[in-house]
Amino acid sequence: MTQVHFTLKSEEIQSIIEYSVKDDVSKNILTTVFNQLMENQRTEYIQAKEYERTENRQSQRNGYYERSFTTRVGTLELKVPRTRDGHFSPTVFERYQRNEKALMASMLEMYVSGVSTRKVSKIVEELCGKSVSKSFVSSLTEQLEPMVNEWQNRLLSEKNYPYLMTDVLYIKVREENRVLSKSCHIAIGITKDGDREIIGFMIQSGESEETWTTFFEYLKERGLQGTELVISDAHKGLVSAIRKSFTNVSWQRCQVHFLRNIFTTIPKKNSKSFREAVKGIFKFTDINLAREAKNRLIHDYIDQPKYSKACASLDDGFEDAFQYTVQGNSHNRLKSTNLIERLNQEVRRREKIIRIFPNQTSANRLIGAVLMDLHDEWIYSSRKYINFDK
């Protein structure tokens, strides 16, 4: 049988390995290279060749043990050299540990990105030749829990968040053989420099003044401060909680929701001129000009029965819908909850693989991990969300 001999240094062999993996050489050749590399490293550790008599000898050879090693070309079965003193450890397995950690991190990343545990297991097996069970992937995701909890409860007192945007996302959770609807309250904070951050989330039993007050107190207990404007839809419980939790703070009613509410009170047919007139009001970024336009519209349409309810609704909610022009430097990104609506859509896209969470803990873990991921994208972005200088 042909013998393969290596005359290269360990560093050179390591370099060959790295390039070999990239070139998809056969597993047999790569196994031979790894085994020879480890043999060379044992010789260097002992400072004596096999059967060599020398005063520099540090230990004795002590056979081998088998160990699996996962690479991009598949799983290799290696013969790992041992020494009598038990202190020798090939550098290959320092890389192995990093490889394993990278593989696990990749599995977690796939999970957070919206890949089911079944698909994660299949992808890992196809890429690495290594079989992992769905239960292993599920248990691995539990490692996210302490990270999510720490992030979810981090202090907010280092910054001021003058602009606070809130919304709720509904999910399904299994409890005692029942499938229940749960509300995930989410808050985005925008700094005076125009940076956006996801500053908190909390899963509760529903949307009411009580649950929103609990959520706001959770934010304040973590150090939320400097709030000047809260942007949200007009859910009664939410608005009441805002008034209760944030005194001397303005509320910006989401203009998108407000327009939608107004238009639901008018006929779909033969109402184009009224619709365009209402939309025109919301193009103003000066509250005084908008107010004048609103008053003219009401004067023109209030006596028409089919528009009377819409006019009353517009008049009643107008001031709240234009608070961003007073407290938000009239910046268009503060006049609606579009930002948090898009965030919810991204969370929904990733969590829909679950459909029904087995318990609230798993829901908190996945949604928290997704929000952490999106939060990192925001804070490391080179672009500000709002440029208040313009």
Swiss-Prot record:
Cross-referenced Pfam families: Transposase_mut
Keyword annotations: DNA recombination, DNA-binding, Plasmid, Transposable element, Transposition
UniProt-listed InterPro entries: Transposase_mutator
One MF annotation (Gene Ontology) recorded for this entry: DNA binding
Single biological process term from Gene Ontology: DNA transposition
Source domain of life: Bacteria
Keyword flag Mitochondrion: no
Family to which the UniProt record says this protein belongs: Belongs to the transposase mutator family.
Job of this protein: Required for the transposition of the insertion element.
Protein name: Transposase for insertion sequence element IS256 in transposon Tn4001
Organism: Enterococcus faecalis (strain ATCC 700802 / V583)
